[in-house]
Amino acid sequence: MKKLALVLLCIFILMLPSTVSAERKIPILIYHSIDEFKGHGVEDLYVSPANFEKQMIYLRDHGFTLLTFEQWNDAKNIDKPIFITFDDGYKNNLNAFAIFKKLETNHFKPKGTIFVISDFVGRSNRLSWLELKRMADSCLFSIQSHTANHPDLRKIKDYEYELKVSKEKIQRITGHPVIALSYPYGLYNDKVLAETKKYYSFGLTTIPEPFIEKGIQDERYLLPRLYVKYSTTIEDFAKLVDNK
């Protein structure tokens, strides 16, 4: 009887998931400009509209669910969650908006998060408040904060303006909650984290890896992101989102 119990115990232990296999990797992608690169600026901060559409089709055809940070807690109940983010609020993000509308069906609901620099809104190459409002109301995009002026947050003193005023301005225009901050240049320190926690529920870095929940302190304020570049092929993209 003891021998049988020991055998059953060993079988039970072998059936338990290992720590490594139990780790759930959630990709959070970062884009900037959705446009053809015309020789100005940094090439790998662009992704062509054609490539972006192919990437979204890949996600659709491979069973991914695109989420915004308002849906963070839903991720644990979804088989293949992914977050699509755009930094800086460039006007060419309207290309992503058009592609999302084109691909949206009853079975595929594309969603993305645009992190805008609130004092830059309305500049010639940036989205206007009217455009941001329209995107937010479509429920295809969540509009969140990339601060007021895009400073290195480690070197400033007026956190209230960069974090609180930026948040309030975006909320007032879009009519939707602002709960996430993208750190300019991906830079932060303990002071930045402490100030961010006063106004936001999430902080996003540019640490190049998928998110793995580890239960560490300030985990939601240290969210990593994976860059999608102009040079990213669809094969590269597949490896990126499938964590290969």
Specify the residue positions occupied by each region the protein language model found.
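Short, well-structured secondary-structure segments
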Residues: 27-30, 65-68, 83-84, 106-124, ...
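Acidic (Asp/Glu)-rich catalytic clusters
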Residues: 98-109, 125-144, 197, 213-217
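C-terminal active-site subregion of NodB/CE4 polysaccharide deacetylases
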Residues: 22-85, 90-93, 154-244
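Bacterial N-terminal signal peptides
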Residues: 7-15
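Positively charged n-region of N-terminal signal peptides that target proteins for export
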Residues: 1-4
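Electropositive, surface-exposed helix/loop patches at the edges of structured domains
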Residues: 93-112, 240-244
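Substrate-binding clefts and substrate-entry loops adjacent to catalytic sites
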Residues: 144-157
